[in-house]
Amino acid sequence: MNRKQHFRPHVQGESLENKINQLGDEVFEALLPSMVTFAASVFIWMIYLGFLPVSLLSAVFMTILLVVFSVRAFAKIRKLNRQIKNHRKGLDGERYVGTKLERLSSNSTFVFHDVVCGKFNIDHVIISTKGIFTIDTKNRALPDRDYNKADFIFKDGELIDSTGVLQSDLMHKIESQGRWLEGKINEWTKKRYPVYRVGIMIGAYVNNINKDFSKYWIINDGAFAGFFDKEREKFPLNDVLRIADSLQRFIEKPIA
């Protein structure tokens, strides 16, 4: 597992942090036309008021242009700010869970963060003699509910929130992550290893109706470590080292 110094793995939430920075750039780009038009409008009005000859029509035109650009910029920035807020909440969740997962690291348990897989990324991956896990974290604002009522109900591979809405997109994402890693491991080792699909719902009460954790672990942030500790040893250490090294080679990237 020793790697060259000019390579580094992703850190917790790196993809989300990059998205936040990109959205910040888009906010500036949205403001730029308004700022330029504002400066031009002030300049033209100063001219119209007596410094240099200019028509009233030009001043009015620039003012209208400023209003149009400002309204468009306001609408776009409002949307971007919502996205930034959601990404920051997700980033906080990823880092919070990632810090807890790091405590599980050992000579037989390897924790990876922000594994980029083309169109999507996996928040965390654990490669261990106790099993292989893809982990997706959700840090959502939870609606008010009765004390004994679950925030999420998991049954027969389906996840339903407390308002009765089926979380099919989330389950599809969790399934896709596990299937992707299973395929990659098979590609690297020419063997098939089962992967647990984990969804960590931060601060939520999740009711697993069937008590079936053979494939999916839809649990809250306080439960994962306990579930993991109770798992029996499944894979030889040499297999784990080989898979972990292959994954590290896949996710590492050069430092510019």
Language-model features, listed with the residues they occupy:
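Surface-exposed interaction regions that form or flank ligand-binding interfaces
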Residues: 1-120, 128, 132, 141-146, ...
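Phosphate-centric recognition/catalysis
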Residues: 123
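Activation of the activation-loop gatekeeper triad in protein kinase-fold domains
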Residues: 138
